[in-house]
UniProtKB/Swiss-Prot annotation:
It catalyses: UMP + ATP = UDP + ADP; CMP + ATP = CDP + ADP; dCMP + ATP = dCDP + ADP. Its cofactor is Mg(2+). PANTHER family: NUCLEOTIDE KINASE. ATP binds at G69, S70, G71, K72, G73, T74, R182. CDD domains: ADK (cd01428). Residues 89-118 are annotated as: NMP. This is UMP-CMP kinase 2. Its EC number is 2.7.4.14. It comes from Oryza sativa subsp. japonica. CMP binds at N150. Catalyzes the phosphorylation of pyrimidine nucleoside monophosphates at the expense of ATP. Plays an important role in de novo pyrimidine nucleotide biosynthesis. Has preference for UMP and CMP as phosphate acceptors. GO terms for molecular function: (d)CMP kinase activity; ATP binding; CMP kinase activity; dCMP kinase activity; UMP kinase activity. The keyword Secreted does not apply. Monomer.
Amino acid sequence: MWRRQVGALLLRHRSTPSSTLRHHLPLPVPDQSPPLASNLLLRLFTSQSGEGGDGATKPFIAFVLGGPGSGKGTQCVRIASDFGFAHLSAGDLLRSEISTGREKGELILNIIKEGKIVPSEITVELIRKAMESSDAKRVLIDGFPRCEENRIAFERITGTEPDLVIFFDCPEDEMVKRLLGRNQGRVDDNIETIKKRLKVFESLNIPVVDYYTSRGKVHKINATGTEEEIFGAVHKLFSSLRF
């Protein structure tokens, strides 16, 4: 399943994305019929995928989940640095594809501008190709899967499951406080928007956490406290693993 005849994708998008794209990539909603542009995009990705495999060893895959403001992105950077992981973000990969100006990127941008959802298959293909082109033996996938539809698509397309799922468990009031601390705009509007994001996260992402908990793959990290305190727990966990 781990084909190498694919175009290289940037693991970390280095150009400055627009604030609109960074903050308004739509959340996945299950059972939404894909538009015509999505169908064309699926065909483009499928037609350019390599066929067959070369027997490459599957990397150690860790999903990193947590609500907005839980600090998972910050912790991922430190995990990647200290333990030799490639750090992949689905949002960054979509933005990177858009920034190329190629046909696939333009189609993704049009879907987002229309307020529609980029199909799970597209996001998974970007992740799969990034894993293959990185040649990394250990991969962190940050903030994905965001819903059960994402999870099912990942397992179907890659033919594998994650080896580990890290869930940064953070109380809602703490996440709200952190997110408000990042913003300088109208506080009332920010609170309303943040609480909506948290409700969407709970309804879509928690079932994924529950599923992998039933598979014995989830390690919960208490995401309250300082960055150093949280990383202390993270470091202890990763130091105990055998890759």
